[in-house]
Amino acid sequence: MSDRNPLIDADRRVDEDNTLRPQTLDDFVGQAAARANLKVFIEAAKVRGEALDHVLFVGPPGLGKTTLAQIMAKELGVNFRSTSGPVIAKAGDLAALLTNLEERDVLFIDEIHRLSPAVEEILYPAMEDFQLDLIIGEGPAARSVKIDLAKFTLVAATTRLGLLTTPLRDRFGIPTRLNFYTVEELEYIVRRGARIMQMGISPDGALEVARRSRGTPRIAGRLLRRVRDFALVAGADVIDRKIADEALSRLEVDNRGLDQLDRRYLNIIARNFGGGPVGIETIAAGLSEPRDAIEDIIEPYLIQQGFLQRTPRGRVLTAVAWQHLGLPAPAEIIQQSQYGLFMEDE
């Protein structure tokens, strides 16, 4: 049974978060380089009167890939259609989506790395030549049919760039990587969210929520809602640092944004395997969590925060992780950390 706190599980979608979504690129906070480039590409496409080139967003869950896709459609003044890789089970599903698109429409496919090979093959000519190549019938009576499509823009999102085949990856003219947000960016997002919810929040209260949001706007919005609930029940009109700290502590989110499952992950490596190296499959078995969830949701933030290193022999805790757990680090871990002897696994 999973111990992950759904309040800060960035892999889940909550409809109520839609009210906090920015509506334009100017409103969108963070990802400055990506936003600046997208503005140029969108404006150029509008000047040319053509469909925007296909866009691939890469990054951990909750950083704004879906929101950016929606904003792009609005900025282009076209329709927005959304689906995900697992939903498109067969070629006919994709054909139905593509044939219903109008000129320059934006089609968003989340988790595109989970498309089946058969569906992916259909997507190649659709992206490159705006044509569908379909086989009608079976056996000797089978025939190939070409269907012309409206010139559309495919915006795709993935958390696992390495799982995309090279032919598919190379067909995206605008690959864009999204990174974790800074505390300052998240603090602005929290203040904006509180304003939308008509809830007062002090600067130190906003900072406390931002610090514990794992660098992820979706989590910041979710935590803000729960902190607001605690504040309302306590009869407070303003969320200050004390209320935010008490609420987040009760939600088991520590001062570095780690939840119960993150700490179990670190403790398994520290207490059961002396800090590592240990393989991902062993960790997954110890946590009773799928490997994909660990690699997509837990590890990116731990690596980014300096708690974990991935080496050719497995996962290894850093001195920072040992300190956070309140445990003495082995001498070799301290030495290796000081001299940077670990090599990142590709």
Curated annotation (Swiss-Prot):
It is an enzyme of class 3 (hydrolase). GO terms for cellular component: cytoplasm; Holliday junction resolvase complex. Residues 255-346 are annotated as: Head domain (RuvB-H). Its EC number is 3.6.4.-. GO terms for molecular function: ATP binding; ATP hydrolysis activity; four-way junction DNA binding; four-way junction helicase activity. Has 3 domains, the large (RuvB-L) and small ATPase (RuvB-S) domains and the C-terminal head (RuvB-H) domain. The head domain binds DNA, while the ATPase domains jointly bind ATP, ADP or are empty depending on the state of the subunit in the translocation cycle. During a single DNA translocation step the structure of each domain remains the same, but their relative positions change. This is Holliday junction branch migration complex subunit RuvB. ATP binds at residues 20-21, 62, 65-67, 128-130, 171, 181, 218. CDD domains: AAA (cd00009). PANTHER family: HOLLIDAY JUNCTION BRANCH MIGRATION COMPLEX SUBUNIT RUVB, PTHR42848. It catalyses: ATP + H2O = ADP + phosphate + H(+). Keywords: ATP-binding, Cytoplasm, DNA damage, DNA recombination, DNA repair, DNA-binding, Hydrolase, Nucleotide-binding. The keyword Hydrolase applies. Transmembrane segments: none annotated. It comes from Brucella anthropi (strain ATCC 49188 / DSM 6882 / CCUG 24695 / JCM 21032 / LMG 3331 / NBRC 15819 / NCTC 12168 / Alc 37).
